[in-house]
Regions:
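Serine/threonine-rich low-complexity intrinsically disordered regions
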Residues: 5, 19-23, 51, 94, ...
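Secondary-structure boundary elements
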Residues: 56-195
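Mixed-charge, low-complexity segments
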Residues: 17-82
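Short, flexible coil/linker segments at or flanking structured domains
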Residues: 5, 29-32, 111
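Bacterial Sec-dependent N-terminal signal peptides
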Residues: 1-25
Length: 195
């Protein structure tokens, strides 16, 4: 019985070490991938030296950064945006524009990788705001750290250009959540904001 418990404990320690080693390799790969922007990511890590939870959050973001990018803006992208902005509210796009841009795919544009351009300041602001929302909103408080990292911490959701969306959304919708809704149901809160 004692040997079985010891074997289980030893196995758990080995698995934990292997996972930690894998995460370290991912972090090193991401820092190397950043090339000339590596200093920004190192500044971020240095910033949270004395806050272990935020440091782990920063490492999570950096480890996942080689897969995050947006597309180069300007030129064709601006033309498509202009057409979509003007015609989308009316429900139809003029046939002239449809013929010209109907086949267009922005995925042919050059990718701009976050690791190459993102700043420590942007990430620090994002991490601090995410932690504030984790504690401030009742529906976020029950999230584990792993769920927080997966669902609340990320600074982007797709391939959109980098922007300071947390501040914008907090200014636009925060007062509704602060003054009208006091519950803990995230779906109900989202419904309130979308009205």
């Amino acid at each position: 019985m004692f040997l079985a418990r010891l074997l289980v404990l030893f196995s758990l320690v080995c698995i934990s070490c292997a996972h930690s080693s894998f995460e370290q390799k991912q972090l090193k790969h991401a820092l190397d991938f950043a090339t000339s922007n590596r200093l920004e990511l190192e500044i971020l890590l240095q910033h949270y030296t004395y806050d272990s939870l935020k440091l782990e959050a920063a490492k999570f973001l950096i480890r996942n950064m080689p897969h995050c990018y947006s597309y180069q803006q300007g030129g064709e992208m601006d033309s498509v945006k202009r057409v979509r902005t003007y015609y989308s509210p009316f429900g139809q796009i003029d046939q002239t524009y449809a013929r010209r841009w109907g086949h267009y795919t922005y995925r042919n544009l050059p990718k701009i990788y976050d690791a190459h351009i993102i700043t420590a300041e942007y990430l620090i602001d994002n991490i601090d705001r995410a932690f504030d929302n984790w504690q401030k909103r009742p529906w976020n408080r029950s999230l584990s750290f792993e769920d927080f990292c997966e669902y609340l911490l990320p600074y982007r959701i797709g391939d959109e250009p980098l922007e300071e969306w947390r501040e914008l959304y907090e200014k636009k919708y925060g007062y509704l959540l602060d003054s009208i809704y006091k519950g803990s149901d995230v779906v109900e809160a989202a419904n309130l904001v979308s009205r």
